[in-house]
Amino acid sequence: MEQPEDMASLSEFDSLAGSIPATKVEITVSCRNLLDKDMFSKSDPLCVMYTQGMENKQWREFGRTEVIDNTLNPDFVRKFIVDYFFEEKQNLRFDLYDVDSKSPDLSKHDFLGQAFCTLGEIVGSPGSRLEKPLTIGAFSLNSRTGKPMPAVSNGGVPGKKCGTIILSAEELSNCRDVATMQFCANKLDKKDFFGKSDPFLVFYRSNEDGTFTICHKTEVMKNTLNPVWQTFSIPVRALCNGDYDRTIKVEVYDWDRDGSHDFIGEFTTSYRELARGQSQFNIYEVVNPKKKMKKKKYVNSGTVTLLSFAVESECTFLDYIKGGTQINFTVAIDFTASNGNPSQSTSLHYMSPYQLNAYALALTAVGEIIQHYDSDKMFPALGFGAKLPPDGRVSHEFPLNGNQENPSCCGIDGILEAYHRSLRTVQLYGPTNFAPVVTHVARNAAAVQDGSQYSVLLIITDGVISDMAQTKEAIVNAAKLPMSIIIVGVGQAEFDAMVELDGDDVRISSRGKLAERDIVQFVPFRDYVDRTGNHVLSMARLARDVLAEIPDQLVSYMKAQGIRPRPPPAAPTHSPSQSPARTPPASPLHTHI
């Protein structure tokens, strides 16, 4: 047996969550009717893109397009390639300049206008194509030159027309590829005293900083030194993040029941090598570096052979969004008495003039991201567990805006306004029943199952669920519909029942029937409370954790129903007067992160 340093614990291999990087999208920039700053010709525009740090909110230059001479309607060739995270608010800023010299110093060029948006706004627009007016923000003086410079605030001069910016997002093709492969091994080292080894493979993707991230683990083959593992599939972006020459490290272990797996050896390869398929290039010597150092006659600890390799493109979340799939967002808020009297500062519903309460923080964190995937920005908002005026009837499915026919509110601000108004008119009561609001959203989801709509229900609650059996049944029934459920637990209650509904460990069932999909994600709000008061950062983490599973849940539903993405809508054509004076096409240029 090897020394303890050649052993690995089981936990090292089982945490694969979050190992798949975001997909990459390519942003193309065009402008129409820019300001004309040149006396005897048209402007020579350049676009600069900035990203914003989540922690310090500082704008950082991401990249620049090329300069296009003598046009007010540029179609820039150089693209911006960025990582896309559905679950994050990725703020972007685009500044336009009229270039007057070869100087890279932007202060030496005329400012033409700017636009702010999020990456989600671009992706979620029809056809993933967003048009925004350019504005000239407030100016400040450059401390070195004294020349006016645009401030980074989102201010604008009322009535000042600076033209339009057109932003298009396209998912990179290699981000949708899925590789399917199979391996076998020969003459692996024997690690067990009373039998042969129980080998398995662990695959790692190399990172920019030289570290490695686990991305796949095969099954264990019992009692053999010549295993043939099952075929497996993995997204190419998980294997190499789209870089075909990036190192892929594969470690070979002998499985042990107590979790102290014995290291047999390792080898490295790359996606480009694997893509050659079965050949002499894909027979790898398994080497144990420690044995190689200690033993002069050491050759290897066996070989691993690639038996087959194939790659195909799969439909992705962005394919469906670009094809017009709308995400319908509904929020349901807990109005039970366990929240405490809203007029007292100890209440979870207390409305402080200085900061948002937990309900409003959670709603805003999730809503401000998901809102960009719904074109009309009208969101149903429900309450449960309250007595309603005028007769004190208890309801577990009432509209926050008071409109029984149409519970939709305009934007996230509209939901917050209706929520605050409800706190002043209803009486907190109980019990904590989820089934009515789950059934409400499921009913709407069932009405449209052609792939054009997908519903997301956000439930924010403080208490122990009262109708567990009914809620389980409602979720099992909803799992076959185009919908997902997010539950955020606020306050200090025990949320064991919510963890059960989450179904990450054990898929929930009702009356002996298993849910077809895992559609519930639960997080306790207290895990995201920042003691320093930095709610921006902590709520960004909350949104990331509860929204991260939505894209895969949407795609899993579409696949199960055999629904393919629709073709994206055609981009509007511009009148001849707006046609750009195009620069001759050049070979594609890209700006990477």
Swiss-Prot record:
The keyword Phosphoprotein applies. This is Copine-5. The keyword Repeat applies. One of its GO terms (cellular component) is neuron projection. Its cofactor is Ca(2+). SUPFAM superfamilies: C2 domain (Calcium/lipid-binding domain, CaLB), vWA-like. It is found in: Perikaryon; Cell projection. Ca(2+) 5 binds at D192, D254, D256, D262. Binds 3 Ca(2+) ions per C2 domain. It comes from the Eukaryota. Probable calcium-dependent phospholipid-binding protein that may play a role in calcium-mediated intracellular processes. Plays a role in dendrite formation by melanocytes. Ca(2+) 2 binds at D38, D98, D100, D110. Residues 2-134, 161-284 form the C2 domain. Pfam families: C2 (PF00168), Copine (PF07002). Residues 572-581 have a biased composition (Low complexity). Residues 562-593 are annotated as: Disordered. Ca(2+) 1 binds at D38, D44, D98, D100.
